[in-house]
């Protein structure tokens, strides 16, 4: 019985953790749509938006070039 409780808890935890990371779409002023893995972070000091692309590469874009950020 305890074995089933552990398995059910592990599966529930896996679903809870996987639901926390959403993908976002950034629309740029020149018409590009950038898909991100997780929420982009805006640095007010530098004016850059940091994000990870769909392949997992760390990228940055100037905040002035982004028109909107939408959760997917």
Curated annotation (Swiss-Prot):
Topology in the lipid bilayer: Lipid-anchor
Signal peptide range: 1-19
Domain of life: Bacteria
Localisation per UniProt entry: Cell membrane
Lipid sites, type S-diacylglycerol cysteine: 20
Pfam families the UniProt entry points to: DUF903 (PF06004)
Keywords: Cell membrane, Lipoprotein, Membrane, Palmitate, Signal
Entry GO terms, CC: plasma membrane
Family the UniProt entry places it in: To E.coli YgdI.
NCBIfam families referenced in this protein's UniProt entry, alphabetically: lipo_YgdI_YgdR
Name of the protein in question: Uncharacterized lipoprotein YgdR
Species of the source: Escherichia coli (strain K12)
Gene: ygdR
């Amino acid at each position: 019985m305890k074995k089933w409780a552990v398995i059910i808890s592990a599966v529930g935890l896996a679903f809870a953790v996987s639901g926390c990371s959403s993908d976002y779409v950034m629309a740029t002023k020149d018409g590009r749509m950038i898909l991100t893995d997780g929420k982009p972070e805006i640095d007010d000091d530098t004016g850059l938006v940091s994000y990870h692309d769909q392949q997992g590469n760390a990228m940055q874009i100037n905040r002035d070039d982004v028109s909107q950020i939408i959760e997917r």
